[in-house]
Amino acid sequence: MIFNQTEKQEKEYLQQVITTIHDTINTTSTSVKEHIDTLQEYKDYLWSNKDIDPHEIRSMRESILNHFALGENVIDKRRRLSKILDIPYFGRIDFQEKKDKSQVSPIYIGIHTFYDFKQKRNLIYDWRAPISSMFYDHELGEATYSSPAGEINGTILLKRQYRIRKGNMEYMIESSVTVHDDILQKELCSNADNKMRNIVTTIQREQNRIIRNENAAVLIIQGVAGSGKTSIALHRIAYLLYAQKGQISSKDILIISPNKVFADYISNVLPELGEETVPETSMEQILSNVLDNKYKFQTFFEQVTELLEKPTQDFIKRIQYKASFEFISQLDKFILYMENNYFKATDVKLTKYITIPAEFINEQFKRFHRYPIRQRFETMTDYILEMMQLQYNLTVSTPEKNQLKKEIKKMFAGNNDLQIYKDFFEWIGKPEMFKTRKNRILEYADLAPLAYLHIALNGNNAQSYVKHLLIDEMQDYSPIQYKVIQKLYPCRKTILGDASQSVNPYGSSTADMIQKAFATGEIMKLCKSYRSTFEITSFAQKIQPNNELEPIMRHGEHPKILPFKNTEEEIQGIADLVNSFRNSHYTSLGIICKTESQAKELVQKLQIYANDISLLSNQSSAYVKGIIITSAHMAKGLEFDEVIIPQTDDKNYHSNIDKSMLYVAATRAMHKLTLTYSVSSPSCRFL
């Protein structure tokens, strides 16, 4: 006999579950009030009895802390229950264990576990629970899952999916595949949101394997455009917080994000899944912090802009060289060279009668070779003075000790990071590979190697408080940057991106290069593209072919390339497309230009036609819904119902980096894509 066989029975059961959740929320609210009242009683007692003995104070302090902790737990439970009221669950499997064929357990799956103490059973299982993995991994028939007690084998007899909104069941589908196509198609056909959403209802088998991978110390996810890699990485974080509760918390995780807009765009996913948001930072901030924020430097955004607007072959060569493994090898050789050649010991007159010989000082420099060079001076000073104490019964003052340390430090010719970095390029015979800009501004590509040298000389100051590091847009970071990350963050890592979407092809990394940089790592691939229609994905594939990409069979309009007589008519044409968007059922439109300066110029030109257009720039900190004009660089990782790409002529899009930008722009579109250009310029070679 199937439990809740009909849709009517399922709807009745849903209301029973919601009623039980309501009752539990009311109970927890009463419990919260009781804890608050008790804490107030303790407070009043302490105020009115100031002469109580220390033993009683200690006892009361323990009671207060205990009540406070219990109260926080109850508040957290109430918060979680409130989150599942609207959508208690989304799936169900009926599982029969092999060892007990007399019992069939209906497993309802939702965002959170809900245990009913009256019935003494789970009414809802958390999607991250071991038993819930079968919902994503198995069809009807034989199935298995890993539990703390070992592998559990059995049979899935029934599989259902529900769409529940605001406590009402809109429909129910019997499902015989991993996630029913109807559900997935309905989700994919919906409009883009102003924030990334959780995808627990539509997680696919290959995505689930990535989410639940607990073995890889470094997990590298190569995911094609629209494969959901960022969302999957965030669901992976939520899973790890659940599976390793007590070992890791939200504050122990760090996300390296490409920009503030993207960080804002993804900020809702973890809270939707019942977890706190995690700290985020940027690669630039990390590298600058290593260097004590001493140097002014070109940002990554500024580097990309220069490559798009005024590239020179010398600039490209400098970036390419510093993104090579040969460069890292040469740096390592130079660090060894400094060890053997940059310390020149001299005699030091300690007192009127005692001189420390240069040879003895040099011996101590070698004695402490396990220490980073700049950490050695303190240890050497202490050891030398200890020897002086033993041999001459000499005791020195703190100022005298500091003076000796200063003398020893001066013997090392590498106390200035920037100078030794310049020395390095002279040493390898490539002085032209280092160039500062006006006002001594460093090029972006020099920031990581400078930090690498600094760490080699000063010690790595590992950030041990971070227990899991998530790096998004992995392709935009070079091997030397990953080497710095390896030294700073010895924790587990999830690294994700797409080699086809680099906005800096001259200094980018593939999954294989990242694996080589870390000398370890498991590469997992996401090849199915879900974001765009089949027609848009096929169009983008012509710009930048990727044989591994599998488009989903969701059909829509063919992308349009609209020619105009001149620039003025092109602007008018874009304004007409904006008006058409306003009259459509779509809610987000991205007008994606090659560069930010082009985006700013277009905003000015379109102002006479519309006042509801927002510019998303490098200075922006939040993603806004509606009509947005932005650059391809800033649009990376975002998605829109409709996309317009202006100025798609050969004058504007002709280089390798231009091609990458065009591909990124085209793959932002979910449902509709239009490209415009003026016929006064030749048509684009990539279209």
Predicted segment positions?
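Conserved phosphate/pyrophosphate-binding and hydrolysis machinery centered on Walker-type P-loop NTPases
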Residues: C189, D193, Y321, R370, ...
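Short, well-ordered alpha-helical scaffold segments within catalytic/effector domains
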Residues: M196-V200, Q204-N208, L234, A238, ...
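P-loop NTPase Walker
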Residues: M1-K33, Q40, L184-Q303, K636, ...
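Conserved helicase motor core of SF1/SF2 NTP-dependent helicases
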Residues: G246-Q247, K251, K260-E276, T281-I286, ...
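A structural signal for short, well-ordered beta-strand segments and their strand-loop junctions
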Residues: R92-D94, I220, I255, T674-Y677
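Extended, charged low-complexity regulatory segments
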Residues: M1-V200, Q204, N208-R212
